[in-house]
Amino acid sequence: MASKFGYRLTKRAESDLDGTVSYIAIDLANPQAASDFVDKLLYNIEEARVFPESGSLVDNEFLQLENVRKKLIGNYIMYYLPNTVENIILIHVLYMVNKISLIFI
């Protein structure tokens, strides 16, 4: 896939990813699953870069940003914002079981 858009991560998304990968690799003692998660995440980021509007539009009246999109990655939800300067902004990566994820669904 040839990338159309670049991407960047918010500090929150960086923290989400660090915590998720650490939890899977160390707490669950499954580094292969952590690596698989990263591979799936990178695939979905690449897909969003090529097709920025491919994720489902998040419909939430309490969300202050418009045009936030989401992609499902196994048991996780990746929230991102395609913007007008030809990049996507990865906002959040949440475990779907977390009640906080219900706010964004």
Regions found by a protein language model. Give the residues of each.
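Residue-level signal for beta-strand positions within conserved beta-sheet cores that form or flank
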Residues: 3, 66, 87-90
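Generic N-terminal leader/processing signal
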Residues: 2, 10, 68-69, 73, ...
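Short linear functional motifs in flexible/disordered or boundary regions
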Residues: 25, 29-32, 36, 53, ...
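Arg/Lys-rich, positively charged N-terminal/basic patches that mediate binding to nucleic acids
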Residues: 1-40
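Basic/aromatic recognition patch in beta-strand/loop cores that engages polyanionic ligands
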Residues: 55-85
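Enriched for short, Lys/Arg-rich terminal
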Residues: 28, 73-77, 81-105
